[in-house]
């Protein structure tokens, strides 16, 4: 019951924090130039968050269980076995250790690639409905907005699964670490999403709806995961390090959205095929500085979180 109360409070805090962070660009009236600058900053936040926060946290969650398990196993072995068996046991232990590490390396790559490929397929399915329209440029732009929101919602849902799986372990420290990691990138992601949608010309009411769906995805999925897991499922999940796998899958979706949609849209790359179009001029020095700053902010926050 205590776990249920804690997961409920964490979910509520996640919803409110994410929505408030996303409302900031809507609450302030920006000029055209300022809006572009904020959008570029938001794009930097998305990229920096994917690379500096989500991937390391996912890898950490994946390895933490194994390292803790090895620590307990080693101490038990030390207490139980006789000294003449110690050398033999340590050889077996070393072999198991390297085997586990090989498995974990595979988990990291597979989870990231699956997340990226999943979003790629979603994007292509969306694009297949676009080619039949009269104005492919406008249709592609509209599709880009939907895919960006969908990608971030899928990512947030995977975050929710990670938090729900963490809550099911009944370890408060694990729950808090996963919660802080999620909040560190959900707030910048909400800001980045809203500024991108504003730049893309979506009406404010629709932006609020997109933001609400994004803000709800993680809390709802964390509750569903927590309530839907039976005791045997929880044990199976802890065996395969579900928290780490879910976070790395969501990192793959996040990377796709940040690099394939948001950055090209902001830089005007690939959306205009005419040589004289203004969209292909690239970024000004100030915009590049904002992009770099956006990439560095999550890195600084994550370094502060680790210490």
UniProtKB/Swiss-Prot annotation:
One Gene Ontology molecular-function label: G protein-coupled receptor activity
Membrane-spanning ranges: 4-24, 35-55, 106-126, 146-166, 176-196, 210-230, 244-264, 286-306
InterPro entries: ZIP (IPR003689), ZIP9 (IPR045891)
Keywords attached to this entry: Cell membrane, Cytoplasm, Glycoprotein, Golgi apparatus, Ion transport, Membrane, Mitochondrion, Nucleus, Transmembrane, Transmembrane helix, Transport, Zinc, Zinc transport
Expression triggers: Up-regulated by testosterone in cancer cells.
GO cellular component, one term: mitochondrion
Organ and tissue specificity: Highly expressed in pancreas, testis, and pituitary and moderately in the kidney, liver, uterus, heart, prostate, and brain, whereas expression is lower in the ovary and colon.
Ligase found in the keyword field: no
Glycan attachment sites: 29, 241
Catalysed reaction equations from the record: Zn(2+)(in) = Zn(2+)(out)
Main subcellular location: Golgi
Bilayer topology term: Multi-pass membrane protein
One of the protein's GO biological processes: zinc ion transmembrane transport
Function noted in UniProt: Transports zinc ions across cell and organelle membranes into the cytoplasm and regulates intracellular zinc homeostasis. Participates in the zinc ions efflux out of the secretory compartments. Regulates intracellular zinc level, resulting in the enhancement of AKT1 and MAPK3/MAPK1 (Erk1/2) phosphorylation in response to the BCR activation. Also functions as a membrane androgen receptor that mediates, through a G protein, the non-classical androgen signaling pathway, characterized by the activation of MAPK3/MAPK1 (Erk1/2) and transcription factors CREB1 or ATF1.
Protein name as catalogued: Zinc transporter ZIP9
Species assigned in the record: Homo sapiens
């Amino acid at each position: 019951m205590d776990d249920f109360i804690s997961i409920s409070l964490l979910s509520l805090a996640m919803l409110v924090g994410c929505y408030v962070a996303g409302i900031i660009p809507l609450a302030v009236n920006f000029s055209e130039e300022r809006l572009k600058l904020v959008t570029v900053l938001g794009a930097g936040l998305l990229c920096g968050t994917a690379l500096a926060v989500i991937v390391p946290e996912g890898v950490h969650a994946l390895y933490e269980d194994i390292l803790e398990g090895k620590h307990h196993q080693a101490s038990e072995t030390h207490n139980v076995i006789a000294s003449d068996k110690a050398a033999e046991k340590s050889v077996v232990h070393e072999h198991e250790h390297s085997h586990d590490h090989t498995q974990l390396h595979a988990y990291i790559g597979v989870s990231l690639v699956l997340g990226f490929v999943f979003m790629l397929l979603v994007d292509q399915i969306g694009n297949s409905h676009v080619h039949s329209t009269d104005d492919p440029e406008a249709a592609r732009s509209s599709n880009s907005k939907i895919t960006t929101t969908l990608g971030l919602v899928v990512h947030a849902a995977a975050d929710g699964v990670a938090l729900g799986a963490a809550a099911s372990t009944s370890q408060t420290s694990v729950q808090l670490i996963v919660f802080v990691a999620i909040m560190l990138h959900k707030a910048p992601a909400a800001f980045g999403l809203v500024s991108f949608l504003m730049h893309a010309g979506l009406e404010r009411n629709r932006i609020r709806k997109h933001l609400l769906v994004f803000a709800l995805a993680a809390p709802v999925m964390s509750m569903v995961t927590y309530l839907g897991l039976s005791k045997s499922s929880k044990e199976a999940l802890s065996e395969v390090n579900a928290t780490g796998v879910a976070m790395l899958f969501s990192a793959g979706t996040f990377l796709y959205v940040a690099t394939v949609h948001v950055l090209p849209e902001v830089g005007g790359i690939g959306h205009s095929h005419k040589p004289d179009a203004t969209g292909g001029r690239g970024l000004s020095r100030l915009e590049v500085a904002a992009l770099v700053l956006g990439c560095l902010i999550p890195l600084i926050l994550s370094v502060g979180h680790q210490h």
